[in-house]
Amino acid sequence: SAASDVYKRQVYPVITGSGGLTLAKHLEVPFTQEVVAVSTALQDYAPQCDVAIELGGEDAKIIYFTNGIDQRMNGICAGGTGSFIDQMATLLQTDAMGLNEYAKNYKSIYPIAARCGVFAKTDIQPLINEGATKEDLSASIFQAVVNQTISGLACGKPIRGNVAFLGGPLHFLSELRQAFIRTLSLGPDEIIAPDHSHLFAAVGSAMNYSEDVCVPVEDIIARLKAVSYTHLRAHET
């Protein structure tokens, strides 16, 4: 059967991303640092890239490529990330894509704190009570993410030249991407927005595969079944 053929197919597995190192150890497969994976993919797709901005569900990072690699990443707080956007969308009784649609027709931007969901809620609730439109609030939420990323991660280091936008939020939310472009005053030739930007770390990790580790898919599935979530968490702490 087709399933049997897939299970027996030989693959070169590689893991990257948050929490990936622990899983890679238990599965006995190679691990690639996310910054290495992203750098590899960008060198292949857009070697002219000077800076990459990547937003994930709970992390945000800026990677500078000029004069060596310099990665800036947020700490334990998920402010200004995908989960923050989801929290704010719930306040407006919509989802992330709903925010994106609203933001397309904004007229005003309000100051909102993005360093923490709690602070942001205290900024947004009075605006809702005062009758601010969902269009303006949505655009303001995206602008808050931009401000948090630039001020919290760049810390004064200029973001200039050719800039790549990576990760799920920047891939699916066109208005969030536009808020960055607008704030950074980027020209059309300076914008790097790959078609599969939300999968860039995975693409880059695959490009860093090891020829020494080749196993059938069914072996990986068996190893996954043998690893418990509780066991993984115990090894991360």
Predicted feature locations:
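Conserved phosphate-binding catalytic cores of ATP/NTP-utilizing and phosphoryl-transfer enzymes
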Residues: 19-66, 70, 150, 154-155, ...
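Adenine-nucleotide phosphate-binding core of ATP-dependent small-molecule kinases
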Residues: 120-151
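Glycine-rich phosphate-binding loops at beta-strand->alpha-helix junctions
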Residues: 18-19, 155-183, 194-198
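Short, small-residue-biased leader/transition segments that mark boundaries at the very start
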Residues: 1-7, 234-237
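Glycine-rich phosphate-binding/hydrolytic loop that grips phosphoryl groups
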Residues: 85-86, 193-228
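Conserved phosphate-binding/catalytic loops in two-lobed NTP-binding clefts
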Residues: 31-35, 181-203
